[in-house]
Design a protein with these regions (language model features):
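Mature catalytic core of soluble alpha/beta enzymes
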Residues: 1-292
Length: 292
């Protein structure tokens, strides 16, 4: 999934931790757009035709389609062609190039089809999908839940800043987390206390690169324009019942103005903190419930 992983397991053992790492590698092998043999690449190559994929792949794509509906298309997994056009063509960790899919279109989110009975995923003709805006959160949720089901009393799974919290730590009633401040490296803009759930952060400061002409850009695409979003948000952190929801809503929020993003988050009863391009900090009223 092109990121670092950090796992904290309470009440478990090294075997549980090793199994969780293997599980993350398995999910990445199915979902990475940089692998020739992943479910996502195979489905993209067969755009317009049903492709047999793993059950977890069907589940994460179905969850992505729910997020597409909830955000009125602001979250859209069919923006991969625009992501590639913007320059995000190689894995940030392995530097492996993404498979060449030829010319594809964006904005086809309504046409992605999941068939649980047949076990197939159909990418729209002429389209291509990428789970970059939800896959890490969904994987964190799965692995954290599986750790607790296997006997751990608490699990924290952090995949590139998208975090799932299940159960509780053995030395405290809740988990304590810090939100990095993009205005001052090495500092926190806020510290949080969460009993369980998910937290995710999106922003324009990490997946960012420079073109030959000296201009810089990032990977967060506005489905309405096909271009990297630039509406005034530098970073946004969302707290939700699970990490997949938090991640998909942070991705959608990046395609909106700070005010509109806060309004959307409030509409769904979530909590958020926004740091704007002009260094303001905005929060939803519900954010104060999590502040440590």
């Amino acid at each position: 999934m092109g990121c670092s992983a950090h796992l904290v397991v309470h009440g478990g053992n090294e075997l549980l931790l090793a199994a969780a790492v293997d599980r993350l590698r398995e999910l990445e092998s199915w979902w990475s757009r940089f692998r020739e043999d992943s479910d996502i690449t195979l489905a993209n190559r067969r755009a317009g035709l049903p492709t047999e994929v793993h059950e977890d792949t069907l589940a994460v794509v179905a969850r992505a389609m729910l997020a597409w509906r909830q955000t009125a298309g602001k979250f859209d997994i069919t923006t991969l062609p625009a992501v590639l056009a913007a320059g995000y063509t190689h894995s940030a960790t392995t530097h492996q190039p993404a498979p060449d899919l030829g010319t594809r279109r964006i904005g086809l989110g309504a046409l992605v089809a999941v068939d649980y009975e047949a076990g197939t995923l159909t990418v729209p003709p002429g389209g291509a999908i990428d789970l970059g805006g939800i896959g890490k959160g969904f994987a964190a949720d799965l692995v954290a839940e599986e750790l607790v089901e296997a006997g751990a009393t608490g699990a924290l799974v952090n995949l590139g800043g998208d975090i799932a919290l299940v159960g509780s730590p053995s030395d405290a009633p809740s988990w304590h987390l810090g939100i990095d401040d993009p205005r001052a490296t090495g500092t926190h803009v806020a510290t949080l206390r969460m009993a369980c759930g998910g937290i995710a952060t999106s922003g324009t400061t990490v997946r960012r690169w420079q073109h030959d002409d000296g201009t810089t850009t990032h990977h967060l695409i506005d489905p309405a324009t096909g271009r990297p979003a630039s509406y005034g948000i530098r970073t946004i952190t969302v707290m939700a019942a699970d990490a997949a929801t938090a991640e998909s809503f942070t991705t959608a929020a990046m395609t909106m103005t700070p005010t509109d993003a806060i309004a959307m988050i409030q509409k769904f009863g979530l909590a958020a903190l926004v740091v704007t391009d002009d260094h303001q900090v905005l929060t939803t009223p519900t954010f104060e419930e999590f502040r440590a």
